[in-house]
Every structure is written in structure tokens, then in C-alpha cells.
Amino acid sequence: MRRAIEFLVAALVAASALKQPLPAQQTRGLRIAGAQIPVTRDVNANLVALEHAVQYAAAEKADILLTPEGSLSGYFADFDQGRTTAGLERITAAARRAGVALALGTCFQEPDDGRKYDELRFYARDGSYLGFHAKVLLCRRIANPTSRGEIDYFSTRPLRTFELGDVIVGGLICNDLWANPEWTPQADPHLTQQLAGKGARVIFQAVNSGLVQSADLELTRPYHESNLRLRARAGKLWIVVADAVDPEGRLANQCPSGVVDPSGNWALRVDSHDERFFAYTIELK
């Protein structure tokens, strides 16, 4: 009888434990800001736009600000290295004072090897430099193989991740994500999947997709958007994207700016005309 009672008590305790609610999963919010801004040859004009973006990010209490491809130097192979270096000191100092981390798109000539790179440079909130992602899928027009393109002017480096506090993130630049078959001499290495395999939870994509006013927009924009959404879903990734915009506000860019969630849906998306800033809190479990 005693053993039967002990068994019954144990069963009741086990049943009670099963009814207890599971502990809630801990979430961590990463507040991001993005800048859809004009990118020109004028480094000083670019700096003005970038400083406005930093001010916006600080007002939104963002952890990090993403800018478009070439947003400091201009998106040109013959960028002015001296002015870019001086501008880099100015914008990183502004971000440090504001307490905002940076994912800054710029072309840059690295002092360790003297080579030019199309970069996404990462800085922590205290201004410390975390390193850079170099564009991997450098472009050349496939239909005209004798033409010169990015691949003839810029070098690249191995894919890597970065740590923003306790969050592992990755950076990609424009064609790195969608490997446009008209502009990509290399095979598609599926860089989003590689970054997911390296533990990245969030990818920051700096874009300078080009401005068009033709039927091409009906083809290229859906291609870019579907790649963003499918690759986010495939890698269970958050993807934050910031594209350059027409300084005159007439032409549309070829890629939406905003935030795509791990289900492949837009969490936030901005209009493709004019300068736009945006902010969003990514909840990471």
C-alpha cells in the first residue's frame, strides 16, 4: 500500500510539472537605422547627408546605422582617397559622439596592401573599428566581355562576420546578394547562406542599384526584391538594406530600402524616391 501511495504522489507531482508554463524565450532588441540617400562624386555633399543620417539614428536611439554602397567616397573607381580618408575621420567621430554604430558603405584604398576595395566598414558605438566586408561579386557586363567593370578596379577579401555586442552580423554589398546573371562573371556562392552558416543573425546590405526610367525597372526591381525575400527566408535571416537615391528625386532606384524578416516578408519598406531615413527594432530570440 505504501509503495502504491508513493507512486501516486510521484505521478501527481509529474503531472503538475507538465502543467507549468514553459519559461519565455529571452529576446534581445537590435535597433537599426537606415539611410536611403544620394551618393555623388562630391565627398563633402555625401558627408552632409551622412551626418543628417547619424543625427536621425541618434534621435531614434538606434544601435547601428546602415548607409548605401559608396555613400562616403562616391560609387566610382577613381574616388578621391585623400578626401575619403578625411571624411571617414569626420563621420566616424560624429557617430562616436552620437553613440551610434556604423555599417558604412565606401570605396577605400587599404594601407596594408595599397589595393582598392568596395567596402562596408563596421564601427562599434564607441567608435572602435571592427573591420570591413569587401564586395565579393564584383560586376562586369557579361554581354560585353571586353568592357571594364568593378572586377577590373577593385580587389576582394574572404567573407567574414562581425560582432555587435552579443549579436553576430554580416555585411554584403549590392550584387553580393542577388548575383545578377547579366553582371556577374563568377558563379553564385550564395553568400547569405554562407553567412547564416557562420552564425549571422542579421545581414546589412549596402546597395547602389542604379537609377533607371525604362521598362528595365519592371524586370530588375522584382528580381532584386524576390532575391532579398527568398534568401532571407532560406537563411532565416534579418536583412537590412539601404539603396542610393536620385539626388533630383525623379528616377526610382532598382531595389527597395527597408527591413526583411526571416520569413521573407517586409517588416518595413520605404518609398523608392527621395531621401528617406528609417528605423526598426529587430527582436532576436
Pin down the residues of each PLM region.
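Active-site-proximal beta-strand/loop segments in catalytic clefts of secreted hydrolases
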Residues: 35-38, 67-70, 105-108, 133-136, ...
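Bacterial N-terminal signal peptides that target proteins for export
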Residues: 1-8
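Cys-nucleophile CN-hydrolase/nitrilase-fold catalytic domain and related Cys-dependent amidase chemistry
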Residues: 43, 48, 52-126, 140-141, ...
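Short beta-strand segments enriched in small/hydrophobic residues
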Residues: 26-40
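Hydrophobic helical h-region of N-terminal Sec-dependent signal peptides
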Residues: 8-14
